[in-house]
Amino acid sequence: MPIGVPKVPFRLPGDEDAVWIDVYNRLFRERLLFLGQQVDDELANQLICIMIYPNGEDDSRDMYLYVNSPGGAVFAGISIYDAMQFVVPDVQTICIGLAASMGSFVLAGGEITKRIALPHARVMIHQPASSYYEGQVGECIMEAEEVLKIRDCITKVYAQRTGKPLWVVSEDTERDVFTSAEEAKVYGVIDPVAVETSSNSPISKLTKS
């Protein structure tokens, strides 16, 4: 049975009594964001709004984006990536569980040196696919051309963010490539792998909020 969104107490400065708000709103106030489902337009718009809203409040405070996603809509993922590059605070990305397809694309888009994966996380990269298989020949050809353009764009971003040659990324993304956290670090999708004993671990950001 679904338990719904948990609620936690929150007290504004100067207030005596706490109010109960859902846990995501509480964490959003601490700039802790979550990509924990398939990427779609609605989720992308929500995350972009949350990233933009505090943009002028305190530029010195990083944002933390926790990623556990099987991927999803290509343009929605690209829009999240682009927003991360243009907000003033650094966006740290943390992979918990799985970052696949557009999930790994967003993960790689975090601030260089601030992209982290938990020790048992998995990362998967591949080329974008098309779900359009029926229709007139002309429409299929136009879509195929668009898919190739998108693939070229995504391949270039992966190459830029990982430091790998473009031809290597192009060959690797011909198929689904699953990696461990350590392998993702070697490939360049992330930077450090989180250490369980570290007092500054990604999860400690949650417990200190």
UniProtKB/Swiss-Prot annotation:
Tell me a Gene Ontology molecular-function term this record carries.
ATP-dependent peptidase activity
- Might you give the EC number(s) for this enzyme? 3.4.21.92
Keywords of this protein's UniProt record, alphabetized? Chloroplast, Hydrolase, Plastid, Protease, Serine protease
* Record-linked PROSITE patterns: CLP_PROTEASE_HIS (PS00382), CLP_PROTEASE_SER (PS00381)
**Localization in the cell:** Plastid, Chloroplast stroma
Recorded catalytic reaction(s): these are: Hydrolysis of proteins to small peptides in the presence of ATP and magnesium. alpha-casein is the usual test substrate. In the absence of ATP, only oligopeptides shorter than five residues are hydrolyzed (such as succinyl-Leu-Tyr-|-NHMec, and Leu-Tyr-Leu-|-Tyr-Trp, in which cleavage of the -Tyr-|-Leu- and -Tyr-|-Trp bonds also occurs)
Gene Ontology terms describing biological process: protein quality control for misfolded or incompletely synthesized proteins
Q: Which GO terms describe its cellular component?
A: chloroplast stroma; endopeptidase Clp complex
**Active site per UniProt:** 101 (nucleophile), 126
Source domain of life is Eukaryota
Q: Relate the assembly described in the record.
A: Component of the chloroplastic Clp protease core complex.
- Enumerate the HAMAP family for this protein: ClpP
Role description: Cleaves peptides in various proteins in a process that requires ATP hydrolysis. Has a chymotrypsin-like activity. Plays a major role in the degradation of misfolded proteins.
What's this protein's family per the entry? Belongs to the peptidase S14 family.
Q: What is this protein called?
A: ATP-dependent Clp protease proteolytic subunit
